[in-house]
A protein has these predicted regions:
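A detector of single, family-specific signature residues
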Residues: 1-386
Length: 386
């Protein structure tokens, strides 16, 4: 039996993974050659590598495919990549859709491994490329900051409720205030570590400084977007980037019925969350290209929040453009019809929020309600490159 492609899948769990070795024949049939379970550990990885080597044909393309299951796939993917294997990592929703297309009614690890191997044999997919250790650490820190900020917001809400309840528990209030102080200290420590991580890489530091010349875009925003996109390494167009972030528009039309269009939100939620406050700032601080977009959409009767989401998307593409071109913000270049203005630049330091001291009193738009405790960008705190 001649075959033209080899596909090995790994359906990964916390402690073990199910593997399936399949081949695509010259008649374009997918045939399973072997299956086995391995421990999700260095010893299991070594056994898996030997198992694959015994069965593969070195003259035929081989791909190892796995699902992005939390963090559990990372060690195996990294080990195989270091060994020179072609690794493909697919999102869970894509894998699920493919399994459904095969007509499988049951679900278990063995069947999932077979379906993944079938997918790897049938389809041509982009190989997985790990991000640099610097960006990997930066992503960990920015996500930790987001989580601690959310916990801080929850504590503030609980403290507010407790202080206004009929029978106030003084000991509860005291504990909540201590917890709030702890979260605030943690946020400051994480912010300093983010700055130190960026400063440790001169090239990364220089490029992030250029990105933060956009008024309203601070260090935390830039760091989060750069880390979540792996420095835009895998993107060749703005369309790819906006789709990855979930800003692509989904139509809802059938026959004569025309439903509302909306963004898919099937993308990286960390990017969308971090861009919320910068979009408000960019409009209120009159960044011309953002302010013009906001006014054009609201002038057409669009809801204000819809316009702000459009500004978020615009900011993301601007950051992408500045990063790829390795240049700072130039107002007349990106909106020539607007008069030249005095664009904020970062000299000795970069503001966490992207808002200068002179502009802090104008950050909150008159049309927006105060939501300072609901977002991971605390306006007013400074985080500088040292």
């Amino acid at each position: 039996m001649k075959f033209i492609k080899q596909s090995v899948s790994a359906d990964i769990a916390k402690d073990k993974f199910d593997a399936c070795f399949s081949v695509l024949t010259s008649e374009h049939r997918v045939v399973v050659k072997a299956t086995r379970k391995f421990a999700n550990s260095p010893k299991g990885f070594a056994e898996f590598a030997q198992w694959v080597s015994k069965r593969e044909d070195s003259q035929v393309e081989l791909v190892v495919i796995m699902e992005a299951t939390g963090v559990y796939y990372e060690n195996l993917a990294w080990t195989l990549h270091q060994a020179g294997r072609k690794v493909v990592v697919v999102l869970p929703n894509r894998a699920k859709q493919y399994v459904q297309s095969l007509g499988h009614k049951s679900k278990n690890d063995r069947l999932d491994a077979r379906a993944l191997a079938h997918m790897g044999a049938e389809r041509d997919m982009e190989p997985w490329r790990p991000m640099s250790q610097q960006l990997f650490l930066l992503r960990k820190l920015t996500r930790e900051h987001e989580q601690v900020q959310q916990m801080r917001t929850e504590v503030i809400s609980r403290l507010h409720a407790e202080c206004h309840s009929m029978l106030q528990g003084k000991s509860t209030v005291r504990r909540l205030r201590k917890t709030l102080q702890l979260h605030e200290a943690q946020l400051q420590a994480i912010q300093l570590e983010i700055a130190e991580t960026i400063q440790a890489d001169p090239l990364l530091s220089d490029k992030i400084k250029k990105v933060t010349t956009i008024k309203g875009v601070g260090l935390l925003t830039a760091a989060t977007i750069v880390a979540e996109t792996s420095g835009f390494a895998l993107f060749t167009s703005q369309k790819q980037l906006t789709s990855y972030a979930g800003y692509d528009v989904v139509e809802n039309q059938s026959g004569k019925r025309s439903g509302k269009e909306k963004i898919s939100k099937q993308g990286n939620s960390h990017i969308r969350r971090i861009l919320h406050m910068p979009a408000l700032n960019a409009v209120s601080l009159n960044v011309p290209v953002c302010r013009a977009l906001y006014e054009r959409l609201t002038g057409k009767g669009k809801k204000k929040m819809v316009a702000y989401v459009a500004v978020q998307k615009k900011l993301l593409t601007l950051i992408y453009t500045l990063w790829k071109k390795d240049e700072g913000w130039q107002q007349d270049h990106y909106m020539r019809q607007e008069p030249k203005g005095d664009i904020q630049s970062l000299e000795a330091g970069a503001s966490l929020s992207g808002v200068s001291a002179a502009d802090k009193n104008t950050v909150a738009p008159a049309v927006a309600r105060a939501t300072q405790d609901e977002h991971p960008v605390p306006v007013g705190q400074e985080l500088s490159f040292r």
